Each structure stands twice: as C-alpha cells, then as structure tokens.
Design a protein with these regions (language model features):
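Acceptor-binding helix/loop patch of EC 2.4 sugar-transfer enzymes
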Residues: 293
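Flexible phosphate-sensing "switch/lid" loops adjacent to ATP/NTP-binding sites
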Residues: 1-144, 148-154, 159-248, 252-272, ...
Length: 294
C-alpha cells in the first residue's frame, strides 16, 4: 500500500542472532545474493525473502542505532517488522499488530505478544475465513479487555497456488514454516490448508522418514504429525531437512513456508509453493489507516 502511494519503504527486522555476531553489526538485504552473502539460515530467509519479493530492502543485525541511521538514508517510511519476537526498538508513528485466532488467548499469555497488543494503535484479526467463530470472539474480547481504544480490522487470509490441479488426487508431503509449528505451537499451516482445499489424495506422515535433528524435533514437539517443519538453523540441519524430504514416499511437496526452499535445498520431487494474502473484510481498511502518510 505504501509503495502504491509512491513511498520508498525500507523494512528493519528484529535481531536473528545466529553465527558470528561481530560481522552482523549492520546487514542490508536487497536481493537473494545478499541472503547467500550473509549465510542466512532458513529461519532468517523466512523473515527477509518476502520483503525482497516485494521489492523492499531489509536491514537487520546487531547495532540498531547504526541500522536506523543507514535505513533513514534511503527511506521515506521505515517499517519495523518484529514478528512476535520483540516490541519495536523505535518510537513509532503508527503501531500495527496482527493477532491469530487459530491461537486464541496467546495474545495475552505470551511475551512480547501481550506487550504488542497493549501498545497497538491498530489490531488486525486475520484468518477469519478459516478460524472457529468462538475463537475469533475470544480474540475480540481479549482486545477489548486490554486495549479498547485500538482500531480493529478483520481480514481473511486466502491461500493460492499457481496450479491447483497439480495437487488434486496426489500423495503429498506438507512442509511448513518451522518456528510457527515448533515454539509457535501450531499443528498446521498454509500448506496443510492448501492440501485439503485443493483435493490431495493423501497427506503423508513424514515422521518415519525423519533423520538427525529433524527426528529430534518430532521427539521434542509431540503435537506435530502430518507436517514437516522447515528447520534449517545451519548447513547441517538444512541437509537433514533435504534428506528427510527426499526419503519421503510421495508425489510432490507442498511448501507453506514464506520462502522458495529450492534455493537452499535440492528436493527430488516437484515443489508447489503456497502463498497467502490479506483480504480485509468491511471497513476500515489498512489503506484508510495508512493514507495519512500519503
């Protein structure tokens, strides 16, 4: 929306402290080669790649004073993108927080999620097209309880693939965003929803095919079953993810991660990417909120 207004937007992500922090003081990501240059993990790529796909430069690192000053040199508007790992390191002109009705109550029971909820000027309830009505109401009530002055926007999160017919009647492996499934507590993501929606014949259980640290992940997170978390906190784990995928007996891989996993591993099966977007329901919309910056 901001780009459509003609604004130059630069995103700043919260710290992803993997590897040698002394060489990560101020990192700039403008294209995919920068992800390789900085030896990004899958988890880092999941945060940076969607911005790059949208033509937005991303900064991250260690020294957030220096990062801010560098970002200011090339931006009209700076977007702090902290995920649910931090509240903003900077004083903001507008604070937008997204809440997930698939995890009702988490907005009050986790730090810094609760802090973000209380600080928000605008709160977006997404996934209302797939969430349970009672869970949506729980989230609404919790917002009213702790931040009644926030502007609330409700939205669907429609999913899409390039060719749904490729999935129909196929035996599939579903790969999902790792942190969402592990410490995020979710049992499924967009890939699983897509497999169901587009008529996969069977979603295989990847557990028997798991190797190394991927096998350990299943032992630690007992709620995981018909999905494979895209764990990749280093080259060794990426190879174990690749081996697990390649051992699986299926027709194709449905990837619900925010990245193109074929950039970092080499699956021996076709990979179909699932994408999702924000579809506001009713008014106000995000455009209404952001137009004051035009």
């Amino acid at each position: 929306i901001l780009k459509e207004m003609g604004k130059k937007v630069v995103a700043i992500r919260h710290p992803m402290p993997y590897g040698d922090l002394s060489i990560q003081v101020c990192q700039r990501f403008a294209d995919y080669s920068d992800l390789d240059k900085h030896k990004c993990t899958i988890e880092e790529r999941e945060e940076y790649e969607p911005h790059i796909d949208n033509g937005i430069i991303v900064y991250a690192g260690v020294d957030y004073e220096k990062i801010l000053r560098e970002a200011e040199k090339e931006a009209d508007i700076i977007l702090w993108d902290g995920g649910n790992n931090d509240f903003s390191f900077y004083h903001t002109d507008l604070y937008i927080v997204l809440v997930d009705p698939h995890r009702p109550g988490h907005e009050l029971s986790y730090h810094p999620g609760e802090v973000n909820l209380k600080m928000a000027d605008v709160i977006i309830i997404n996934k209302i097209d797939t969430a349970n009505a009672d869970d949506i109401n729980t989230v609404r009530q919790n917002i009213e309880k702790v931040n009644p002055n926030a502007l609330v926007i409700e939205a669907a999160s429609p999913i899409s693939v390039d060719d749904p017919d490729e999935i129909r009647n196929k035996k599939v492996l579903v790969v999902e965003d790792g942190p969402t499934l592990t410490h995020g507590g979710m049992a499924f993501g967009a890939g699983f929803v897509a497999a169901k929606k587009f008529g996969a014949k069977e979603i295989i259980n990847p557990k028997p095919y798991a190797v190394g640290s991927i096998k350990d992940t299943y032992q630690k997170y007992k709620h995981l079953s018909l999905i494979l978390p895209a764990m990749g906190y280093g080259q060794k784990q990426m190879k174990e993810l690749e081996e697990t995928i390649n051992r699986c007996e299926c027709d194709l891989v449905i990837s619900g991660t925010p990245i193109d996993i074929t950039r970092v591993i080499s699956p021996n099966k076709p990979v179909i990417r699932v994408k999702y977007s924000l579809q506001e329901i009713g008014n106000p919309t995000l455009y209404d909120v952001l137009k004051k910056f035009n």
